[in-house]
C-alpha cells in the first residue's frame, strides 16, 4: 500500500489536499506546493494527522495565518497543517479562551465587545492566535506574554499539555514553542475590565497609526527584521538609502523601510535575495547586523526539482 493510499484510509474524513500551492495562503503571495495540505476541523483530527506523520516518518509543520513567513518557491515537503478551522473563541468573566486558528484581530474585537482591556496592542496584528503565541507577537509596547494566562499544546509526541507563561519562556519575538516542536491548541488570556469607549478609542488610534505608517495595500510578510537593541530596523535601512531598493518583484517599502512588499509578481527567491542584500548593506553602512524576524520555510525551487515526485522521509 502506498503512503497516499494508507493516508486516505487512516485519515479518512480529514480535508487533505495534495500538491497544493501555498502562495494563495500566504500574505506574501509567494510559495511553492505543499505535498499534503491539511485542514483539521478540531484538535482530535490534528492529533490523528500528527500521529500518522510520526509513524510514517513524514515531516510535518503547522502554519498559522502565514502572515510572518516566506514559503520558498520549491514548497514544503510532507504535511503542512493549517488550523484556521480551530477558531472558537469564548469569554468567561475577564478571561478569553481562543483556539489556535482564531484570527488575532477578531479576538481583540471580541475583547472590545466585552469591554475587556489589555488586548488593544494587537488590534492590527495580522495572523492567528497560535502564531502570535509562537512568536510572542507584539506592537506599541504590548506583547502576548503580558496577557497570556495559560496555553494548551499538543507535543510533538502527540500528548496534550497545559503550559503557563513561565513555561513558555517568552522573550522578544520568541517562545519556548519554537524549540519544543509543540503545537498550540488553545490559549487563555487574562484581561481586565475596562470602558468600551476608551478601549475603542485606543484601538482606533493604533489602527490609524498602522494605516498611516505601514504599506498595507501590498502583499508583505510584515516586519522583516527584529528590532536591534537601541535602534529601529526601518530607520537603519532608510539611513542606508535603501527605501525603494528592489530585486525582482519585491522592494523595500518607501512608506516603511522595515517592510518588503511584493509589487510585481515577486518570488520567494526575490524576498530572500533582497533580505540578504539589505542585511549586507546595512552592516556596511552602520556596522549593525540585522536579524530576521520573518521565518523562511521550505525548499528552493532547484532543490525541489531534484526530489520531484517524492520526499526523503525524515524525523521532524
From Swiss-Prot:
Localization in the cell: Cytoplasm
An individual GO BP term: cell wall organization
One GO MF term: flavin adenine dinucleotide binding
Gene3D superfamilies: 3.30.465.10, UDP-N-acetylenolpyruvoylglucosamine reductase, C-terminal domain, Uridine Diphospho-n-acetylenolpyruvylglucosamine Reductase, domain 2
Superkingdom: Bacteria
Pathway: Cell wall biogenesis; peptidoglycan biosynthesis
Keywords linked to the UniProt accession: Cell cycle, Cell division, Cell shape, Cell wall biogenesis/degradation, Cytoplasm, FAD, Flavoprotein, NADP, Oxidoreductase, Peptidoglycan synthesis
NADP keyword on record: yes
Cofactor(s) this protein requires: FAD
InterPro entries for the chain: FAD-bd_PCMH, FAD-bd_PCMH-like_sf, FAD-bd_PCMH_sub1, FAD-bd_PCMH_sub2, MurB, MurB_C, MurB_C_sf, Oxid_FAD_bind_N
GO CC term, one of those recorded: cytosol
Enzyme class: oxidoreductase
Listed NCBIfam families: murB (TIGR00179), PRK13905.1 (NF010480)
Free-text function comment from the UniProt entry: Cell wall formation.
Family recorded in the similarity comment: Belongs to the MurB family.
Protein name: UDP-N-acetylenolpyruvoylglucosamine reductase
Organism: Streptococcus pneumoniae (strain ATCC BAA-255 / R6)
Phylogenetic classification of the source organism: Bacteria, Bacillati, Bacillota, Bacilli, Lactobacillales
Name of the encoding gene: murB
Amino acid at each position: 500500500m502506498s503512503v497516499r493510499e494508507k493516508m486516505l484510509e487512516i485519515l479518512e474524513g480529514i480535508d487533505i489536499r495534495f500538491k497544493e500551492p501555498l502562495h494563495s495562503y500566504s500574505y506574501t503571495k509567494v510559495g511553492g506546493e505543499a505535498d499534503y495540505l491539511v485542514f483539521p476541523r478540531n484538535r482530535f483530527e490534528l492529533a490523528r494527522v500528527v500521529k500518522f506523520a510520526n509513524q510514517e516518518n513524514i515531516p510535518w509543520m503547522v502554519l498559522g495565518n502565514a502572515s510572518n513567513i516566506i514559503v520558498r518557491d520549491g514548497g514544503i515537503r510532507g504535511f503542512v497543517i493549517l488550523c484556521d478551522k480551530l477558531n472558537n473563541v469564548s469569554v468567561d468573566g475577564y478571561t478569553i479562551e481562543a483556539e489556535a486558528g482564531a484570527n488575532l484581530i477578531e479576538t481583540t474585537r471580541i475583547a472590545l465587545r466585552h469591554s475587556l482591556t489589555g488586548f488593544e496592542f494587537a488590534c492590527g496584528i495580522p495572523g492567528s492566535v497560535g502564531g502570535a503565541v509562537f512568536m510572542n507577537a507584539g506592537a506599541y509596547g504590548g506583547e502576548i506574554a503580558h496577557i497570556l494566562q495559560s496555553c494548551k499544546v499538543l507535543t510533538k509526541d502527540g500528548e496534550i499539555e497545559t503550559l503557563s507563561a513561565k513555561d513558555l519562556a517568552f522573550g522578544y519575538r520568541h517562545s519556548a514553542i519554537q524549540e519544543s516542536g509543540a503545537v498550540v491548541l488553545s490559549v487563555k488570556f487574562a484581561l481586565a475590565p475596562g470602558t468600551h469607549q476608551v478601549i475603542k478609542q485606543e484601538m482606533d488610534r493604533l489602527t490609524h497609526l498602522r494605516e498611516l505608517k505601514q504599506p498595507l495595500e501590498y502583499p508583505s510578510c510584515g516586519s522583516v527584521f527584529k528590532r536591534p537593541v537601541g535602534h529601529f530596523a526601518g530607520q537603519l535601512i532608510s539611513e542606508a538609502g535603501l527605501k525603494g531598493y528592489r530585486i525582482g518583484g519585491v522592494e523595500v517599502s518607501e512608506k516603511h523601510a522595515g517592510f518588503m512588499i511584493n509589487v510585481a509578481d515577486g518570488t520567494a527567491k526575490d524576498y530572500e535575495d533582497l533580505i540578504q542584500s539589505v542585511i549586507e548593506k546595512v552592516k556596511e553602512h552602520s556596522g549593525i547586523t540585522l536579524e530576521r524576524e520573518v521565518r523562511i520555510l521550505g525548499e528552493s525551487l532547484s532543490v525541489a526539482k531534484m526530489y520531484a515526485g517524492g520526499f526523503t522521509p525524515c524525523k521532524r
